[in-house]
Amino acid sequence: MDSIQIVGGKKLKGTIPISGAKNAALPLMIAALLTEETVTLDNIPHLADVELLIRILNNHGVGYAVDGQKSHHDCIDSRTIHFTAQKITTTYAPYELVRKMRASFWVIGPLLARCHEAYVSLPGGCAIGTRPVNFILEGLKTLGARIAIENGYVHAKAPKGLKGAHYHFPKVTVGGTHVMLMAAATANGTTLLENAACEPEVTNLIQALNAMGAKITGEGTSTLTIEGVKKLHGARISVIADRIEAGTYAMVVAMTGGNVLLKNANPHHLTQVLEVLQKTGLDIEIKPQGLHLKRNPRQTKIMPVNIKTGPYPAFPTDLQAQFMALMTRAQGTACITETIFENRFMHVQELTRLGAQIKLDGQTATVYGREHLQGAPVMATDLRASVSLVIAALAAKGESVINRVYHLDRGFERLEEKLARCGAIIQRITV
């Protein structure tokens, strides 16, 4: 099993290319099920979750072809993948595939829209709280679907097709918004979605669906109107840059100090995160090619900042663990409140193995900053927790080994390569 070995204490200098966003790529790939024509996606990252979804789509009869492009300057591949769902061969999504990644459940929307039936296993993915699919199922019911849960599977039917409806999400849900957009795109009539997610990844999907012939208005807001069309066609769409990856590397630079350009990072998708990081002492300059980050540890200490996670444009829950790692070396005390998922502090126990001082009280963590952390062997519990341990280890004295890094491979493309090119002492090892 692979592990990541890190010797901390090195400042970073260089350029880190930001990959395409996993959270945008997955729904765009699933949207290819909606048309028999070819959907071409540019800037697809090399990630375990992407490869798994390719297998799932292939299970439904989706053909694909990959164009690989390599930048000699960045030494990171970017890919274009052509997906063609000329004929859906099955509406059955088995447990052995869906259990590995929660987003794979989203195929229920396009399958129901195009084939009027779907038989999909209840999902898996990172073990963060319950993350119920109730909002998705209730939304599909409003579009006229009949839903039954049998032996761990959702059996959805709409023999006469889906019909436009009005649905108010009880709670903001990115996955639920993705599914309802795809299901309603070809429904008979107009659908109004209220309290919808307005994340950049949702906007990316709306733009893709509109490029395929859908009629969706309201992008970037919580109220979306979908005028159903009879048929969608092929299109070419580029996956947006990964704001979570960009935010993560920004926190790495804030933690270790250094001088780094985050190439292709979109500052408009990180407004609140960048405001918070500036308060911690990170110097941020927006340039045409991305974000230029600097911190001199001798001149600027890490300052504590309190945060509360929330739906976009608030501070993203997917950067909470990384920010907590940064605060472990702040000059004072910081409070971090998680409002999106319960049980998303599983990284705390492992951070304390590196010397962090953290107190938990319900959904709030109080972090008591320390001057130094100490390297140690640690265990990743989920995707974002794993990268928080990387951040802490990069600043810790001595050697750390992070185990179970398969979590890391689900969401970060070639992390050790990108960091090593900027001077970090980091390598993948097999133990």
From Swiss-Prot:
GO MF entry, a single one: UDP-N-acetylglucosamine 1-carboxyvinyltransferase activity
Keywords: Cell cycle, Cell division, Cell shape, Cell wall biogenesis/degradation, Cytoplasm, Peptidoglycan synthesis, Pyruvate, Transferase
Chief location: cytoplasm
Cellular localization per UniProt: Cytoplasm
Keyword Plastid: no
Pathway: Cell wall biogenesis; peptidoglycan biosynthesis
2-(S-cysteinyl)pyruvic acid O-phosphothioketal modifications at: C126
EC code: 2.5.1.7
Domain of life the protein comes from: Bacteria
Catalytic activity: phosphoenolpyruvate + UDP-N-acetyl-alpha-D-glucosamine = UDP-N-acetyl-3-O-(1-carboxyvinyl)-alpha-D-glucosamine + phosphate
Any one GO biological process: cell wall organization
Role noted for this protein: Cell wall formation. Adds enolpyruvyl to UDP-N-acetylglucosamine.
Family: Belongs to the EPSP synthase family. MurA subfamily.
Alphabetized NCBIfam families for the sequence: murA, PRK09369.1
Protein name as catalogued: UDP-N-acetylglucosamine 1-carboxyvinyltransferase
Name of the gene encoding the protein in the UniProt record: murA
